């Protein structure tokens, strides 16, 4: 869909919303005397637009909304669960309000005078404290679950002795199951198609390194289950996680520095500490407007002390886990360096698979072999091998 078609689609959908909504603020708007102005916002996998509704005569802004058109990678997400989380976080005043949810797009509150977390202050103490509180709130969206994995199938059981006051809903979606039964299958199918076309159209002579990389990708996909199971614990406890904690999924009020959390399509039950490790992991990358990365930046050990501070807070709010030996052993495990590095392996493999799931030969070839997905896969592949040696 080109830009003009997309603008028409957005305008049509927003006008339809304005015509049906019963909100007093919207009812007061004369639909015959307005026009819409669209501004594209930063985003990695979705198309986000600031929609300003203006009065024709005065150009006065009557209302502003965020229109989010779901992108290709968001198809692996759960938009219904995401809408529940948005509602929950908005009540906690750490996320924008949801106005309308449809199959291909979403309308949300626009929070003015905000920006993404600046790269220079990612490890500012105030930022980390706010981030910790948001992730802790996230963890309490559902009950804590006990899980065990047998024959690549995960079984979960909610723990009802969690004496917190947060509202609970029943969740069955797990990160492990999403990877095993959804993303991996898509990655395998997509890669096989890509590889077949690559072999047919890219000669081996003169392209030996590219073919070598392709074979390495094939090896990690063929041995996915064996490799992944080395790092994902066979039993333990799960909490609700965001699973995509990078600076582009947070906005910060310019006036007071308050953080708001965005984009929850990857949310699911996952391992404690995953989100904070993901945040440390993603600080190595700069995605928009241009993809920038340096191998020399990777040093997960330097974040381990900050990870332990976060985990200490997690343990304090989940003291009930220490009521039995399984809980005590798991608490000891999640404070260890081995567990922390395993989280990074899991993170790297997850994004490796996500990129593989959306490989397209024609797009790759037309971009002169500089596809974002290929570059990102190379990084994740490199990291996986590097960190595997440490563990």
Stretch-by-stretch model annotation:
Residues 273-325, 345-364:
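Active-site activation/catalytic loop segments of kinase-like enzymes and analogous catalytic loops
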Residues 321-391:
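Helical subdomain adjoining the active site within ATP-dependent kinase catalytic cores
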């Amino acid at each position: 869909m080109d830009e003009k078609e997309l603008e028409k689609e957005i305008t049509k959908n927003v006008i339809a919303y304005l015509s049906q909504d019963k909100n007093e603020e919207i009812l007061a708007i004369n639909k015959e005397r307005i026009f819409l102005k669209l501004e594209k916002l930063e985003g990695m996998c979705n198309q986000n637009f600031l929609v300003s509704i203006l009065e024709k005569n005065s150009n006065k802004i009557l209302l502003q909304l965020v229109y989010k058109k779901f992108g290709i990678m968001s198809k692996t997400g759960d938009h219904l669960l995401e809408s529940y989380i948005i509602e929950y976080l908005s009540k906690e005043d750490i996320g924008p309000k949801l106005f309308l949810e449809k199959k291909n797009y979403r309308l949300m509150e626009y929070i003015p005078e905000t920006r993404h977390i600046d790269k220079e202050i990612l490890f500012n103490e105030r930022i980390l404290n706010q981030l910790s509180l948001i992730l802790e709130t996230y963890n309490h969206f559902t009950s804590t679950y006990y899980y065990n994995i047998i024959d690549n199938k995960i079984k979960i059981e909610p723990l009802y002795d969690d004496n917190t006051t947060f509202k609970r809903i029943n969740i069955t979606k797990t990160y492990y199951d999403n990877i095993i039964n959804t993303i991996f299958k898509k990655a395998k199918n997509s890669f096989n198609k890509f590889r077949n076309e690559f072999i047919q159209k890219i000669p081996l002579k003169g392209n030996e390194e590219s073919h070598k990389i392709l074979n390495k990708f094939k090896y990690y996909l063929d041995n996915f289950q064996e490799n992944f199971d080395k790092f994902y614990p066979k039993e333990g406890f799960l909490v609700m996680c965001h699973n995509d904690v990078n600076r582009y999924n947070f906005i910060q009020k310019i006036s007071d520095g308050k953080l708001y959390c965005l984009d929850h399509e990857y949310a699911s039950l996952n391992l404690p500490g995953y989100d904070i490790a993901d945040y440390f992991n993603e600080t190595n990358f700069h995605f928009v407007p241009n993809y920038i990365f340096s191998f020399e930046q990777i040093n997960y050990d330097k974040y381990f002390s900050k990870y332990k501070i976060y985990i200490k807070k997690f343990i304090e709010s989940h003291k009930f886990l220490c009521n039995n030996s399984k809980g005590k052993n798991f608490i000891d495990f999640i404070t260890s360096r081995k567990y922390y590095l395993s989280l990074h392996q899991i993170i790297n493999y997850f994004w490796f698979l996500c990129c593989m799931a959306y490989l397209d030969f024609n797009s790759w070839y037309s971009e002169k072999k500089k596809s974002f997905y290929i570059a990102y896969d190379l990084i994740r592949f490199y990291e996986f091998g590097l960190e595997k040696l440490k563990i």
